[in-house]
From Swiss-Prot:
Function per UniProt: Protease that can remove conjugated ubiquitin from target proteins and polyubiquitin chains. Inhibits the degradation of target proteins by the proteasome. Cleaves preferentially 'Lys-6' and 'Lys-63'-linked ubiquitin chains. Has lower activity with 'Lys-11' and 'Lys-33'-linked ubiquitin chains, and extremely low activity with 'Lys-27', 'Lys-29' and 'Lys-48'-linked ubiquitin chains (in vitro). Plays a role in the regulation of pathways leading to NF-kappa-B activation. Plays a role in the regulation of DNA repair after double-stranded DNA breaks.
Catalysed reaction equations from the record: Thiol-dependent hydrolysis of ester, thioester, amide, peptide and isopeptide bonds formed by the C-terminal Gly of ubiquitin (a 76-residue protein attached to proteins as an intracellular targeting signal)
Locations listed in the record: Nucleus; Cytoplasm; Chromosome
Location of the USP domain: 257-889
Organism of derivation: Mus musculus
Compositionally skewed regions (Acidic residues) per UniProt: 597-624
Signal peptide: none
Name of the protein described by the UniProt record: Ubiquitin carboxyl-terminal hydrolase 11
Assembly information from the UniProt record: Monomer. Associated component of the Polycomb group (PcG) multiprotein PRC1-like complex. Interacts with RANBP9/RANBPM. Interacts with BRCA2. Interacts with CHUK/IKKA. Interacts with NFKBIA. Interacts with SPRY3, RAE1, MYCBP2/PAM, and KCTD6.
Transmembrane segments: none
Biased composition (Low complexity): 1-16, 898-915
Amino acid sequence: MAAVAADPAAAAVPASAEDRDTQPEAMPDLDEQWRQIGNGRERPLRAGESWFLVEKHWYKQWEVYVKGGDQDASTFPGCINNAGLFEDQISWHLRERLLEGDDYVLLPAPAWNYMVSWYGLMDGQPPIERKVIELPGIRKVEVYPLELLLVQHSDMETALTIQFSYTDSVELVLQTAREQFLVEPQEDTRLWTKNSEGSLDRLCNTQITLLDACLETGQLVIMETRNKDGTWPSAQLCGMNNIPDEDEDFQGQPGICGLTNLGNTCFMNSALQCLSNVPQLTEYFLNNRYLEELNFRNPLGMKGELAEAYADLVKQTWSGYHRSIVPNVFKNKVGHFASQFLGYQQHDSQELLSFLLDGLHEDLNRVKKKEYVELCNGAGRPDLEVAQEAWQNHKRRNDSVIVDTFHGLFKSTLVCPDCGNVSVTFDPFCYLSVPLPVCSRRVLEVFFVPMDPRRKPEQHRVVVPKKGNISDLCVALSTHTSVAPDKMIVADVFSHRFYKLYQLEDPLSGILDRDDIFVYEVTGRIEPVEGSRDDIVVPVYLRERTPSRDYNNSYYGLILFGHPLLVSVPRDRFSWEGLYNILMYRLSRYVTKPTSDEDDGDEKVDEDEDEDVEDDSSSEEEKEEMSAPTVNDGTREAEQEQAGTSSGVTERCPSLLDNSLRASQWPPRRRRKQLFTLQTVNSNGTSDRTTSPEEMQTQPYIAMDWEPDMKRRYYDEVEAEGYVKHDCVGYMLKKSPVQLKECIKLFTTVETLEKENPWYCSSCKQHQLATKKLDLWMLPEVLIIHLKRFSFSKISREKLDTLVQFPIRDLDFSEFVIKPKNESSPDLYKYDLIAVSNHYGGMRDGHYTTFACNKDSGQWHYFDDNSVSPVNENQIESKAAYVLFYQRQDVGRRQSQTSSSDTPASPVSSSTPNSDIMDIN
């Protein structure tokens, strides 16, 4: 769809206020726009309807515009631009791993049509239309349809890429293949799929959906046509079976089996390998004890289907007959019952583990009919009595191998801050999610721009408090630069313009590591007061005129370039000519002044114009004062910054409407050659020709407009981009390792509830921000410890790569369990490590692997999808450790005694650890 833009130079200049006067369809007022789009987004999903993707950044800009209530505001978003959602502008394929809310928003067709009619769509960009599909228990917009490669058995080299919905049937794929390959109606055909192991599987049931058939994007689908003699070509084709050739005669160690990555399913493989190496749970499935306890009628379960799928997976991995298996059937079952795991996006191994443990518990719950149980209230009774009652009540509704193996008991203590009322409850848990001690400091990389134009910008790395303000950044930078903190202003520069001008009280949490932060040296007051004699701060952009191809080079657009400036102008020199001279001085390091010959050769003034030009007969002293700002102690006092928002300072700034600027004109009436012209613009750098300076209700921005020839002759781009690195650039914040027990201790410390989650005090009869403390009362046979490496806040997300040191053996919990020691054995507190789920990478991408100890051999192995290799114990501890599995020592001893009487397991492979694979820190 072609762009609908009001301004002929829309491709060269960002949309400005005047653009809206020539839109193809009259816009409703902003409140009506907000109402129509808001109502559309609240529309419920209906299967088969079309929804459209809109790039999040453009949509947020639109929200700022309509919420501002000013239809002529500088925040006008321009044409809809979805460029950030595409891999390229040739195939227009959608980028992978886009997330709703982070990268895009969804609009129903009516709302999308409104948006396009009001703002237009960027030239050449196709609309991103997606359909709503009906899945088990949920409707969702299918942002990533299934892409299959269709080939004929007779021509395996020519593949067609066709998109299908996951809810389409296999029959539709067959019919599409017949149409694409021009198969005659009377000819018989059938389909095969090639899996990641290279083997071919027949798609027998054509009535099932592609989701149920476990097909995935990029998978090869082969259509074969029956021969004229009635035979099928597959009789002669090698590999038309379900068993990979490499596994036909394989015999290996049970449990040493990889899992094929189906496409971003390493998180699932990691969780499965950890759980598969929990000895008592695996024996439970291998010995078919689960068959007697399958609960097909539990409304909270999956009718036994999840347990059966997991049992099949365990039996295959522990058969010893496979180097690796393809867990597509299990993946399909998980997606069928938990829509969040549908498709092939990356997920969290701990989240899948939580779902799997809960699902297996409900599928294997021995309680067929759950009775109503009242919550256990302490009411001043002894903890031992209340805890025993709470555990019995839990077992009356929840009794399974999962409870036997993984469930423990918390003691939760809440104290009202007003009346001192204490509430004690005992709650079951399946795993511990323990926090990591967080460093209170962070390192920010910034560019310091000194006032002296002879000095290049300096790159600095400064250590600041994580919860500090912009003023803390200025103080830290002051120690490197010897410039007072009150003579600095911090700005976020993006795409050659000021994205945000920070105030001193703004929090540092608003600065992301990827932001380009510039700190400008200034003088005087940051916020001039009307009537004061402080300098006036003017944001300045650099723009270059470029001819527009659409108008045979007769129309010029303007493109921003270089780094923006914040220039302080003395009030007595606040005129166009004074500003020009100050800018020439500020840019003197990389802008060359024209010589006298160039001035004379380029200056041609018409006689009529001469009559209007004042005689340039000022004294040499006056000219010197005009062309070179004064310098005191090597620095210029005429520079001052003013902080604001990304759309400029929102309050009226009287100092910028000084009468001297109103009365002055551009260009100045003098003969000296001008390298650039000046004009007021909005915060986006777009010319606002309809508004004069005296009419500006917000702080004006100034643009320096360069002709291409003048820029080429006098502007040194290499020098302009130059900077120096301060000695502090090499500084790295050292992170000391923490002990696992520190995390557990932090988990059991007293905390105050957040405002979003208050507690209702039965004594005060109102919600209170009570203090809460969790203590460990009873520990399970297998303790799962989840290290909370992912930190979330309202404006940022990060992964903590702190090294957590954890013991392989003899992890003693006796200091954390508060149950009276005379009521339990000391052996119930010591644990040995049996598995670790690792995560490498960042927040939105990464890779999961597993370390696990084989229950039969005691040998540790490294599982990386379908690759498995033995490792030494000293290789297990790393910054990637994410979920730890510990087994109680008394349970391990019982299993060792049992296994010693059984038939010995197959010997461990004699291969040695692969150092190349394990060198991953």
